[in-house]
Design a protein with these regions (language model features):
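Conserved beta-strand
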Residues: 2-11, 42
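Helix-to-loop junction immediately C-terminal to a conserved catalytic motif
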Residues: 34
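Conserved ABC transporter NBD signature motif
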Residues: 42-53, 58-62
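Q-loop/switch helix immediately C-terminal to the Walker
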Residues: 70, 75-89
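Hydrophobic anchor residue at the start of the ABC signature
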Residues: 133-134
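H-loop/switch region of ABC-family ATPase nucleotide-binding domains
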Residues: 180-181
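Conserved catalytic segment of ABC-fold P-loop ATPases
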Residues: 188-195
Length: 203
């Protein structure tokens, strides 16, 4: 059993901090959020709807985005390709790059970050990749975004900018689970926090 006595509730527009003492059960938790893997016992609700339970697993994915310190973006594609073309439900086959760049610009203006829309992801800084992944999640309609240990490889000023973007989207009603080993960082950003020890939640 990787998760035991594990119970968290994340409210709409909340930044929920999760502080793991060790990684035991973390991969299972993240996989469970997205993929509704079979449960021995318990329930999973997403947007107030029952999406997984111990009696029956639907094996359907939830529209939840997970951003780790190692980018999941396609390095050999552009920023706009990663955000728009690779997202689930995108069906257009012939797309003018300029049109996609114009679609992206309002999102960049909103967060006040300048990322070259036509640049290849391999050319971006780590911070720019994190921002691109957040934008990709927002465009895809994710109402819950999980960020895991993203502060490790970016500067303090970049982390402040990332926190500002998280807060902006939280005010728009998007929820976040912010996973970090640093208590001070979680205290600064998060509305509520929980401690995770050996696959259990310690309030």
């Amino acid at each position: 059993i990787l998760l035991d006595n594990f119970n968290i509730t994340v409210r709409k527009g909340e930044v929920f901090g999760l502080i793991p003492v060790n990684r035991y059960g973390m991969d299972a938790f993240l996989k469970l959020l997205q993929q509704n893997m079979p449960l021995h016992y318990g329930y999973v609700y997403y947007r107030e709807q029952l999406v997984n339970q111990w009696q029956r697993s639907h094996n359907r994915t939830n529209r939840i985005s997970i951003i780790r310190n190692k980018s999941s973006l396609a390095e050999d594609l552009t920023v706009v390709d990663n955000i728009f073309v690779l997202r689930r439900g995108f069906h257009k086959y012939l797309i003018h790059p300029g049109m996609l760049e114009r679609l992206l610009q309002p999102f960049l203006d909103e967060i006040g970050i300048n990322i070259p829309a036509g640049a290849y992801v391999s050319e971006l800084t780590i911070f720019q990749k994190f921002v691109t992944e957040v934008l990709k999640a927002v465009v895809a309609g994710s109402q819950l975004i999980v960020l895991e240990n993203v502060s490790t490889f970016i500067s303090e000023s970049e982390l402040e900018e990332l926190h500002r973007i998280i807060r902006l989207y939280a005010e728009r009603g998007i929820s976040f689970i912010y996973i970090t080993a640093h208590f001070e960082e979680a205290t600064y950003l998060c509305d509520r926090m929980a401690l995770m020890v050996n696959g259990q939640i310690i309030k």
